[in-house]
Amino acid sequence: MKKAIIAMSGGVDSSVAALFMKQNGYECIGATMKLYDNEDIGISREKTCCSLDDIEDARAVARKLCMPYYVFNFKDEFEKKVIDNFIKTYEQGGTPNPCIECNRHLKFEKLMLRMQELKYDYVVTGHYADIEYKDGRYLLKKGKDITKDQSYVLYSLTQYQLAHTIFPLGKFSKDEIRKVAEENGFINARKRDSQDICFVPDGDYSKFIENYAGKKYPDGDFVDKNGNVLGKHSGIIRYTIGQRKGLNIALGHPVYVIDKDLKNNRVVLGSNDDLNSSELLAGDFNWIIEKPNGKIKCMAKTRYNMREVPCTACCDGDKVRVCFDSPVRAVTKGQAVVLYDGEYVLGGGTIE
Protein backbone atom coordinates (compact mmCIF):
# COMPACT_ATOMS: atom_id res chain seq x y z
CA MET A 1 0.00 0.00 0.00
CA LYS A 2 1.32 3.44 -0.98
CA LYS A 3 1.75 5.92 1.87
CA ALA A 4 1.13 9.67 1.84
CA ILE A 5 1.65 12.66 4.12
CA ILE A 6 -1.27 15.07 3.84
CA ALA A 7 -0.26 18.71 4.40
CA MET A 8 -3.22 19.93 6.47
CA SER A 9 -3.82 23.62 7.16
CA GLY A 10 -7.13 23.17 8.94
CA GLY A 11 -8.96 24.43 5.85
CA VAL A 12 -11.51 22.68 3.68
CA ASP A 13 -9.20 22.01 0.71
CA SER A 14 -6.54 19.97 2.49
CA SER A 15 -9.24 18.18 4.49
CA VAL A 16 -11.02 16.96 1.35
CA ALA A 17 -7.64 16.08 -0.17
CA ALA A 18 -7.10 13.78 2.81
CA LEU A 19 -10.54 12.23 2.32
CA PHE A 20 -9.87 11.53 -1.36
CA MET A 21 -6.54 9.87 -0.58
CA LYS A 22 -8.14 7.64 2.06
CA GLN A 23 -10.93 6.71 -0.35
CA ASN A 24 -8.31 5.78 -2.95
CA GLY A 25 -6.68 3.30 -0.60
CA TYR A 26 -3.59 5.18 0.56
CA GLU A 27 -2.16 4.82 4.04
CA CYS A 28 -2.19 8.42 5.24
CA ILE A 29 -1.00 10.62 8.05
CA GLY A 30 -2.01 14.25 8.46
CA ALA A 31 0.59 16.90 9.19
CA THR A 32 0.31 20.59 9.95
CA MET A 33 3.43 22.69 9.48
CA LYS A 34 3.82 25.03 12.44
CA LEU A 35 5.49 28.00 10.77
CA TYR A 36 5.39 30.73 13.41
CA ASP A 37 3.90 31.78 16.72
CA ASN A 38 1.36 34.54 16.12
CA GLU A 39 2.47 36.46 19.19
CA ASP A 40 6.09 36.44 18.01
CA ILE A 41 5.21 38.36 14.85
CA GLY A 42 2.59 40.60 16.43
CA ILE A 43 -0.72 39.33 15.01
CA SER A 44 -3.85 38.02 16.65
CA ARG A 45 -4.73 34.35 16.55
CA GLU A 46 -8.08 34.67 14.84
CA LYS A 47 -6.73 36.45 11.77
CA THR A 48 -4.44 33.85 10.28
CA CYS A 49 -3.49 30.23 9.81
CA CYS A 50 -1.17 28.34 12.17
CA SER A 51 -3.48 29.17 15.07
CA LEU A 52 -4.55 26.62 17.67
CA ASP A 53 -8.03 26.68 16.14
CA ASP A 54 -6.64 25.69 12.74
CA ILE A 55 -4.62 22.88 14.27
CA GLU A 56 -7.70 21.64 16.11
CA ASP A 57 -9.75 21.75 12.89
CA ALA A 58 -7.10 19.68 11.11
CA ARG A 59 -6.89 17.27 14.04
CA ALA A 60 -10.69 16.87 14.07
CA VAL A 61 -10.75 15.95 10.37
CA ALA A 62 -7.86 13.52 10.81
CA ARG A 63 -9.69 11.92 13.73
CA LYS A 64 -12.86 11.61 11.65
CA LEU A 65 -10.84 9.88 8.92
CA CYS A 66 -9.13 7.58 11.47
CA MET A 67 -5.79 9.01 10.39
CA PRO A 68 -2.75 9.72 12.59
CA TYR A 69 -2.03 13.43 12.89
CA TYR A 70 1.15 15.35 13.71
CA VAL A 71 2.34 18.94 13.99
CA PHE A 72 5.80 19.54 12.51
CA ASN A 73 7.72 22.52 13.86
CA PHE A 74 9.25 24.32 10.88
CA LYS A 75 9.44 27.76 12.50
CA ASP A 76 13.20 28.22 12.10
CA GLU A 77 13.12 27.30 8.42
CA PHE A 78 10.12 29.56 7.78
CA GLU A 79 11.86 32.50 9.40
CA LYS A 80 15.08 31.98 7.44
CA LYS A 81 13.64 31.05 4.06
CA VAL A 82 10.40 33.04 3.90
CA ILE A 83 10.24 35.95 6.36
CA ASP A 84 13.90 36.97 6.04
CA ASN A 85 13.62 36.79 2.24
CA PHE A 86 10.37 38.79 2.37
CA ILE A 87 12.07 41.63 4.26
CA LYS A 88 15.27 41.47 2.19
CA THR A 89 13.34 41.71 -1.09
CA TYR A 90 11.45 44.80 0.07
CA GLU A 91 14.70 46.37 1.29
CA GLN A 92 16.24 45.74 -2.14
CA GLY A 93 13.36 47.49 -3.89
CA GLY A 94 11.35 44.45 -4.92
CA THR A 95 7.93 43.07 -4.06
CA PRO A 96 8.16 39.43 -2.93
CA ASN A 97 5.71 36.56 -3.21
CA PRO A 98 6.19 34.63 0.05
CA CYS A 99 3.69 31.92 -0.93
CA ILE A 100 6.08 30.81 -3.67
CA GLU A 101 9.00 30.68 -1.24
CA CYS A 102 6.92 28.76 1.30
CA ASN A 103 6.01 26.18 -1.33
CA ARG A 104 9.61 25.99 -2.54
CA HIS A 105 11.33 25.62 0.82
CA LEU A 106 8.71 24.29 3.24
CA LYS A 107 5.93 22.27 1.59
CA PHE A 108 8.01 20.71 -1.16
CA GLU A 109 11.46 20.66 0.40
CA LYS A 110 11.28 20.40 4.18
CA LEU A 111 8.05 18.38 4.24
CA MET A 112 9.34 16.12 1.47
CA LEU A 113 12.49 15.47 3.49
CA ARG A 114 10.24 14.42 6.36
CA MET A 115 8.41 12.16 3.89
CA GLN A 116 11.70 10.48 3.02
CA GLU A 117 12.68 10.07 6.67
CA LEU A 118 9.37 8.36 7.41
CA LYS A 119 9.70 6.22 4.27
CA TYR A 120 6.47 7.54 2.81
CA ASP A 121 5.83 7.86 -0.93
CA TYR A 122 3.98 11.13 -1.48
CA VAL A 123 3.30 14.60 -0.16
CA VAL A 124 -0.32 15.60 -0.75
CA THR A 125 -1.67 19.16 -0.66
CA GLY A 126 -4.97 20.89 -1.32
CA HIS A 127 -3.66 23.04 -4.17
CA TYR A 128 -5.85 23.54 -7.21
CA ALA A 129 -3.41 22.20 -9.80
CA ASP A 130 -2.67 18.89 -11.50
CA ILE A 131 0.29 16.70 -12.47
CA GLU A 132 0.59 14.59 -15.59
CA TYR A 133 3.28 12.08 -16.58
CA LYS A 134 3.90 12.29 -20.31
CA ASP A 135 6.75 11.13 -22.55
CA GLY A 136 9.05 10.37 -19.62
CA ARG A 137 8.53 13.69 -17.84
CA TYR A 138 6.29 15.01 -15.09
CA LEU A 139 4.31 18.08 -16.13
CA LEU A 140 2.49 20.66 -14.03
CA LYS A 141 -1.00 21.64 -15.19
CA LYS A 142 -3.58 24.23 -14.23
CA GLY A 143 -6.46 23.20 -12.00
CA LYS A 144 -9.90 22.69 -13.52
CA ASP A 145 -11.31 25.61 -11.51
CA ILE A 146 -9.54 28.49 -13.25
CA THR A 147 -10.82 30.94 -10.64
CA LYS A 148 -8.86 28.99 -8.01
CA ASP A 149 -5.95 27.73 -10.13
CA GLN A 150 -2.71 27.82 -8.11
CA SER A 151 -0.22 26.62 -10.72
CA TYR A 152 1.43 30.07 -10.69
CA VAL A 153 2.82 29.52 -7.17
CA LEU A 154 4.00 25.97 -7.93
CA TYR A 155 6.39 26.61 -10.83
CA SER A 156 9.47 25.81 -8.72
CA LEU A 157 8.66 22.10 -8.40
CA THR A 158 11.44 19.80 -9.60
CA GLN A 159 10.95 16.52 -11.43
CA TYR A 160 11.58 14.60 -8.21
CA GLN A 161 9.08 16.72 -6.31
CA LEU A 162 6.43 16.36 -9.02
CA ALA A 163 6.97 12.59 -9.01
CA HIS A 164 6.29 12.48 -5.26
CA THR A 165 3.43 14.99 -5.07
CA ILE A 166 -0.30 14.48 -5.52
CA PHE A 167 -2.87 17.25 -6.00
CA PRO A 168 -6.22 15.45 -5.52
CA LEU A 169 -8.30 18.62 -6.08
CA GLY A 170 -6.96 19.43 -9.53
CA LYS A 171 -10.01 18.15 -11.37
CA PHE A 172 -12.60 19.75 -9.06
CA SER A 173 -14.12 23.18 -8.51
CA LYS A 174 -14.13 24.90 -5.14
CA ASP A 175 -17.92 24.54 -4.91
CA GLU A 176 -17.62 20.80 -5.50
CA ILE A 177 -15.01 20.52 -2.74
CA ARG A 178 -17.18 22.40 -0.23
CA LYS A 179 -20.11 20.13 -1.12
CA VAL A 180 -17.99 17.01 -0.48
CA ALA A 181 -16.90 18.46 2.87
CA GLU A 182 -20.50 19.13 3.88
CA GLU A 183 -21.65 15.67 2.80
CA ASN A 184 -18.94 14.15 4.99
CA GLY A 185 -19.70 16.30 8.02
CA PHE A 186 -16.41 18.21 8.13
CA ILE A 187 -16.54 21.03 10.67
CA ASN A 188 -14.61 23.32 8.32
CA ALA A 189 -16.84 22.83 5.25
CA ARG A 190 -17.77 26.54 5.18
CA LYS A 191 -14.56 27.90 6.67
CA ARG A 192 -13.31 31.01 4.87
CA ASP A 193 -10.30 30.72 2.62
CA SER A 194 -6.97 31.58 4.23
CA GLN A 195 -5.17 34.84 3.58
CA ASP A 196 -2.76 34.95 0.62
CA ILE A 197 0.05 36.11 2.91
CA CYS A 198 -0.65 34.33 6.15
CA PHE A 199 1.75 36.27 8.35
CA VAL A 200 0.53 39.73 7.23
CA PRO A 201 -3.26 39.23 7.47
CA ASP A 202 -4.08 42.94 7.62
CA GLY A 203 -2.07 43.68 4.47
CA ASP A 204 0.15 46.28 6.17
CA TYR A 205 3.50 44.95 4.97
CA SER A 206 5.53 47.98 6.01
CA LYS A 207 4.23 47.82 9.58
CA PHE A 208 5.06 44.11 9.77
CA ILE A 209 8.56 44.67 8.39
CA GLU A 210 9.33 47.53 10.78
CA ASN A 211 8.01 45.58 13.77
CA TYR A 212 9.82 42.39 12.83
CA ALA A 213 13.10 44.05 11.80
CA GLY A 214 12.95 46.41 14.78
CA LYS A 215 13.82 49.51 12.80
CA LYS A 216 12.25 52.49 11.07
CA TYR A 217 12.92 53.06 7.39
CA PRO A 218 13.80 56.72 6.71
CA ASP A 219 11.71 59.21 4.81
CA GLY A 220 12.95 60.36 1.42
CA ASP A 221 11.99 62.19 -1.74
CA PHE A 222 9.38 61.49 -4.36
CA VAL A 223 10.94 62.51 -7.69
CA ASP A 224 9.92 62.51 -11.34
CA LYS A 225 11.85 60.76 -14.12
CA ASN A 226 14.18 63.74 -14.40
CA GLY A 227 15.02 63.77 -10.69
CA ASN A 228 12.89 66.79 -9.81
CA VAL A 229 11.65 66.58 -6.22
CA LEU A 230 7.85 66.28 -5.99
CA GLY A 231 7.38 65.66 -2.29
CA LYS A 232 8.31 63.39 0.61
CA HIS A 233 7.75 59.66 0.98
CA SER A 234 7.51 57.87 4.32
CA GLY A 235 9.94 54.99 3.80
CA ILE A 236 10.88 53.18 0.60
CA ILE A 237 9.54 49.79 1.72
CA ARG A 238 6.00 51.23 1.75
CA TYR A 239 5.78 51.42 -2.04
CA THR A 240 5.51 48.98 -4.90
CA ILE A 241 5.65 49.39 -8.67
CA GLY A 242 2.31 50.50 -10.07
CA GLN A 243 1.04 51.89 -6.77
CA ARG A 244 -1.21 54.96 -6.94
CA LYS A 245 -3.16 54.91 -3.69
CA GLY A 246 -1.56 55.94 -0.43
CA LEU A 247 1.08 58.22 -1.94
CA ASN A 248 -0.39 61.26 -0.15
CA ILE A 249 0.81 63.61 -2.84
CA ALA A 250 -1.37 65.98 -4.90
CA LEU A 251 -0.01 67.01 -8.30
CA GLY A 252 -3.28 67.68 -10.10
CA HIS A 253 -3.00 64.51 -12.19
CA PRO A 254 -2.67 60.77 -11.47
CA VAL A 255 0.84 59.53 -10.71
CA TYR A 256 2.16 56.04 -10.05
CA VAL A 257 5.28 54.49 -8.58
CA ILE A 258 7.40 53.57 -11.61
CA ASP A 259 10.81 52.91 -10.00
CA LYS A 260 12.81 53.02 -6.78
CA ASP A 261 16.24 54.62 -6.41
CA LEU A 262 17.63 52.72 -3.44
CA LYS A 263 21.03 54.43 -3.44
CA ASN A 264 19.45 57.85 -2.91
CA ASN A 265 16.34 56.63 -1.05
CA ARG A 266 14.03 58.07 -3.70
CA VAL A 267 10.73 56.83 -5.11
CA VAL A 268 10.24 57.71 -8.78
CA LEU A 269 6.74 58.74 -9.90
CA GLY A 270 5.37 58.86 -13.42
CA SER A 271 2.35 58.33 -15.63
CA ASN A 272 0.41 55.14 -16.25
CA ASP A 273 2.19 54.76 -19.61
CA ASP A 274 5.56 54.83 -17.82
CA LEU A 275 4.63 51.51 -16.21
CA ASN A 276 4.63 49.60 -19.49
CA SER A 277 7.41 47.07 -20.14
CA SER A 278 8.17 45.30 -23.41
CA GLU A 279 10.40 42.64 -21.84
CA LEU A 280 11.87 41.29 -18.61
CA LEU A 281 14.76 39.19 -17.38
CA ALA A 282 14.12 36.42 -14.86
CA GLY A 283 16.61 34.64 -12.65
CA ASP A 284 16.43 31.50 -10.53
CA PHE A 285 14.42 29.99 -13.39
CA ASN A 286 13.00 26.48 -13.14
CA TRP A 287 12.02 24.72 -16.35
CA ILE A 288 9.36 22.06 -15.86
CA ILE A 289 9.52 21.10 -19.52
CA GLU A 290 12.91 20.23 -20.96
CA LYS A 291 15.00 23.38 -21.23
CA PRO A 292 14.45 24.77 -24.74
CA ASN A 293 17.39 25.39 -27.06
CA GLY A 294 15.96 28.43 -28.81
CA LYS A 295 13.07 30.85 -28.64
CA ILE A 296 9.60 29.60 -27.76
CA LYS A 297 6.22 31.23 -28.23
CA CYS A 298 4.06 30.94 -25.13
CA MET A 299 1.89 32.83 -22.66
CA ALA A 300 3.10 34.58 -19.50
CA LYS A 301 1.81 35.82 -16.16
CA THR A 302 3.80 38.32 -14.12
CA ARG A 303 1.29 38.45 -11.26
CA TYR A 304 -0.91 35.82 -9.66
CA ASN A 305 -4.28 37.25 -10.68
CA MET A 306 -3.47 38.69 -14.11
CA ARG A 307 -4.65 37.38 -17.44
CA GLU A 308 -2.00 35.55 -19.47
CA VAL A 309 -0.33 37.54 -22.24
CA PRO A 310 1.46 36.27 -25.38
CA CYS A 311 5.24 36.42 -25.42
CA THR A 312 8.48 34.94 -26.70
CA ALA A 313 10.90 33.41 -24.20
CA CYS A 314 14.49 32.27 -24.53
CA CYS A 315 17.45 31.43 -22.33
CA ASP A 316 19.93 34.27 -21.79
CA GLY A 317 22.93 32.80 -20.04
CA ASP A 318 21.65 31.36 -16.78
CA LYS A 319 18.56 33.56 -16.94
CA VAL A 320 15.46 33.72 -19.15
CA ARG A 321 14.43 36.72 -21.24
CA VAL A 322 10.72 37.19 -21.87
CA CYS A 323 9.63 39.57 -24.66
CA PHE A 324 5.95 40.51 -24.69
CA ASP A 325 3.94 40.83 -27.90
CA SER A 326 2.37 43.96 -26.38
CA PRO A 327 3.64 46.04 -23.43
CA VAL A 328 2.70 44.76 -19.97
CA ARG A 329 1.87 47.06 -17.08
CA ALA A 330 3.73 47.14 -13.76
CA VAL A 331 6.23 44.32 -14.20
CA THR A 332 7.70 44.19 -10.71
CA LYS A 333 11.09 43.06 -9.42
CA GLY A 334 10.74 40.20 -6.94
CA GLN A 335 7.51 38.85 -8.37
CA ALA A 336 7.40 35.68 -10.47
CA VAL A 337 6.98 35.31 -14.20
CA VAL A 338 5.39 31.98 -15.10
CA LEU A 339 5.19 30.65 -18.65
CA TYR A 340 2.28 28.60 -19.98
CA ASP A 341 1.34 26.62 -23.06
CA GLY A 342 -2.39 26.04 -22.79
CA GLU A 343 -3.01 24.17 -19.54
CA TYR A 344 0.66 23.29 -19.02
CA VAL A 345 3.20 25.25 -16.97
CA LEU A 346 6.47 25.49 -18.87
CA GLY A 347 8.48 27.04 -16.04
CA GLY A 348 8.98 30.18 -14.03
CA GLY A 349 11.47 32.45 -12.31
CA THR A 350 11.96 35.63 -10.30
CA ILE A 351 11.73 38.97 -12.12
CA GLU A 352 14.97 40.95 -11.83
Spans of features found by a protein language model:
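AMP-forming adenylation/ATP pyrophosphatase catalytic core
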Residues: 126-131, 136-352
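ATP-dependent adenylation/nucleotidyltransferase module used to activate substrates
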Residues: 1-155, 166, 175-176
